[in-house]
Amino acid sequence: MPDGRALVYSMRGALWKQTLGTTVATQLTAGGGYDYQPDVSPDGKWVVFDRYDGNALELELLDLSTGKVTSLTGNHAANLDPRWSPDGRRIAFVSTSYAGRWHVYTMDVHDGRGANPKRITTDRDSKLPRYYYSVYDHYLSPTWSPDGKELLVVSNRNHIWGTGGFWRMRAEPGDSMRPVHDEETTWKARPDWSPDGTRVVYSSYLGTQYNQLWLMRSDGGDPLELTYGAFDATSPRWSRDARHIAYISNEGGNTSLWVLDMPGTAKHRVEARTRTYLEPVGTLSIAVTDQAGRAMDARVSITGADGRSWAPSTALMHADDSFDRSERHFEVGYYHTSGASTLTVPAGTYTVQVTRGLEYAVGTRTVAVSARGVRSLRIALHRMVDL
């Protein structure tokens, strides 16, 4: 938030708000898709975000005073990485609406409505023999200069490998791009321009197998590493006073939200121990055993009637993208269990599927969870063959 006292972030496919120094998170959105990549407007009244509905990634606008959500795009493309301009009048974002290629756009936003989307990056055939990317250059992760005149973007222009380096350009259609820092980045780079305009923070795996946070001057130069360790640190965002950087890390296991003090190395984890939900919820407890009742390690997939997947708050959810959209709306989400797991879900009907390698038959159950109710489910796996 603009006052630096709270964060808006994505968790469990919804947007949440949490005051720093507390452990209470309040849910802001609850829709039929997955909501993520929020960005709060400079006046603190609006949140632009991405909603994945199973067929497209569309930009949405949340009115924080009313909770109303309004669609900004409806082009059935991949629209992502939305960022407010410093004056709150425009949004920069990435879209595949032109020829299915990744380009940076700007859109005017006034009184909760979007208008006049413009593609500002140039469609360019690089002629390069790229191994896993198109010959056409792509443009990702725009971030605004504090004066609102320029954008810094990630592009693979002149690169064969990786998502590319960092480039600056005026926030106008067809403007030339100036290289700032040449590096073989990944999609996790996600740079953010500092409020004073002198620095850019980003994530990189430079010289290591882990993504860490790095700091560079906005006009180029050698970067400085900010975080160290056998973990990943990604998605950095400056606070408005430039005294803190919020980021995502798997330090300690599961992904979680952290805040790094600037300057310095002090950091702390933001924990949501208490959650205030928008809709009625219940508790689902699942026990996985063999036929003798002994707890078993297994893979668990829990799918709601709307096709979304659910997992315990302490579990790392994985996504299996090998699916047929004519059969299901979203990817199959799953987590691993040592035998017992408990999660909070919106009231409704769920399909629980449990697998354990090729030796055991798949266990499937349908269960209804009522508001404020507790539902316990035991699935005993049948061993078909001993390999």
Region locations from a protein language model:
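A flexible loop/linker signature enriched in serine peptidases of the S9 family
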Residues: 8-16, 20, 29-35, 48-61, ...
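A short, amphipathic beta-strand motif
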Residues: 282-290, 300, 350, 379
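A short, solvent-exposed beta-strand micro-motif common in secreted/extracellular proteins
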Residues: 300, 326-328, 332-333, 347-357
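Short, ordered, surface-exposed loop/turn motifs in non-cytosolic proteins
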Residues: 291-324
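Extracellular beta-sheet/turn segments enriched in Thr/Pro/Gly and aliphatic residues
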Residues: 268-277, 367-386
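Structured interaction patches on ligand/partner-binding surfaces of diverse proteins
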Residues: 334-345, 357-376
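Short coil/turn segments that connect the beta-strands within blades of beta-propeller domains
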Residues: 3-5, 43-45, 87-89, 147-149, ...
